A protein has these predicted regions:
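Short, well-structured N-terminal submotif of metal-dependent ribonuclease cores
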Residues: 1-40, 47-61
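Acidic, PIN/NYN-like endoribonuclease modules and their adjacent C-terminal/linker elements
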Residues: 22, 119-157
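PIN-domain endoribonuclease scaffold, especially VapC-family toxins
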Residues: 32, 42-96, 155
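Residue-level detector of structured alpha->beta connecting loops
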Residues: 37, 64, 107-110, 140
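Short internal beta-strands
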Residues: 39-42, 136
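Residues within well-ordered alpha-helices
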Residues: 55-56, 102, 132, 146
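Active-site neighborhoods of divalent-metal-dependent phosphate/nucleic-acid chemistry enzymes
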Residues: 70-134
Length: 157
């Protein structure tokens, strides 16, 4: 099971793999959704509704089943992650960050996080010590990017 982060959707549709060019990628991701092999927490949808492109927002509305509510087990796991890694949160953001919840979903379902974030070690002067890949590594939760998902699924587009 893949737990999808907002950054994956943004890079997929808004930056690198737009739907008008990479139709087969949309079909492959749709197959994962239909099979129940991927999910995103409801906070990811809220982030997309706030910062996503109009095309991405439209796509999300057509895939409402992808988004899972913040069940108690996810909330408890996310609270534990946020307590251990407080800099995962952005205090300047007007929205609640989905990051800990994305990780919690993968942790609870023995899944893999799919995020386009890079680790703090890969950044020149990171403003914080922990990003999704850093927390995943420390917690033993697998974390890959969208290209990693494509390779893991052996997709040839």
């Amino acid at each position: 099971m893949y737990s999808l982060d907002t950054s994956m959707f943004m890079d997929w549709q808004a930056r690198y793999y737009p739907l008008d060019v990479f139709r087969s990628l949309e079909l492959k991701i749709g197959q994962l959704i239909d099979a129940g092999d991927c999910a995103a927490v409801a906070l990811v949808k809220e982030e997309i509704d706030s910062v996503g492109t109009p095309d991405l927002q439209t796509w999300v509305k057509g895939h409402a089943g992808l988004f899972v509510p913040l069940a108690t087990d996810i909330q408890l796991a996310a609270a534990s992650i946020e307590a251990r890694y407080p800099d995962l949160l952005d205090p300047k953001s007007p929205y609640q960050s989905a990051d800990a919840y994305v990780i919690a979903l993968a942790q609870i379902r023995n899944g893999v996080v799919v995020s386009q974030e890079t680790s703090a070690a890969e950044k020149r002067k990171p403003p914080k010590d922990h990003y999704i890949p850093d927390v995943c590594r420390e917690l033993g939760v697998p974390c890959i990017n969208l290209l990693g998902l494509m390779r893991r699924e052996r997709w040839v587009l």
